[in-house]
């Protein structure tokens, strides 16, 4: 599924609210905290340990979350050029091959946690639209990961 021009415009219009404040660092941290709470076995794969509550104070995890939110912001900025966006995200997926046992099946659950965190931050967020955007973003990353 490719997003329409109107959908891309809506995503771009809502991005400033999604990333407001600290540029998405807290949003990324909330995403990962939810993900690890629901999938504690994934902490080791992502290089973290300890209690999920303690991770809320991890500068390393906050940085990792911000990097992901920054990348989503770049993808949103490039969405009106699907080929460019796909190329950028494909390269990101290729880079993730070197980070250990990162697999395509990790992306859907992480996406659900991202959407939950986004909805908490921005009440009234168009979750259906953002879910479609996340699928496009993650599909391009996965293509690189599996190449």
From Swiss-Prot:
Keywords: Heme, Iron, Metal-binding, Oxygen transport, Transport. InterPro entries: Globin (IPR000971), Globin-like_OT (IPR050532), Globin-like_sf (IPR009050), Globin/Proto (IPR012292), Mb-like_M (IPR044399). Heme b binds at residue 96. Residues 2-146 form the Globin domain. It comes from the Eukaryota. One of its GO terms (molecular function) is oxygen binding. PROSITE patterns: GLOBIN (PS01033). Disulfide bonds: none annotated. CDD domains: Mb-like (cd01040). Polymer. Belongs to the globin family. This is Globin, major polymeric component P1.
């Amino acid at each position: 599924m490719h997003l329409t021009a109107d959908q891309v415009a809506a995503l771009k219009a809502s991005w400033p609210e999604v990333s407001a404040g600290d540029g998405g660092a807290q949003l990324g941290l909330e995403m990962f905290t939810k993900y690890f709470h629901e999938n504690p076995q994934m902490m080791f794969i992502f290089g973290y340990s300890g209690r999920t509550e303690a991770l809320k104070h991890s500068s390393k995890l906050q940085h990792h979350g911000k990097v992901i939110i920054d990348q989503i912001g770049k993808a949103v900025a490039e969405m009106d050029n699907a080929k460019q966006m796909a190329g950028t995200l494909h390269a990101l997926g290729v880079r993730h091959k070197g980070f250990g046992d990162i697999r395509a099946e990790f992306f859907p659950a992480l996406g659900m946690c991202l959407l939950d965190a986004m909805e908490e931050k921005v009440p009234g967020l168009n979750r259906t639209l953002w879910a479609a955007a996340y699928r496009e973003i993650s599909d391009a990353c996965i293509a690189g990961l599996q190449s």
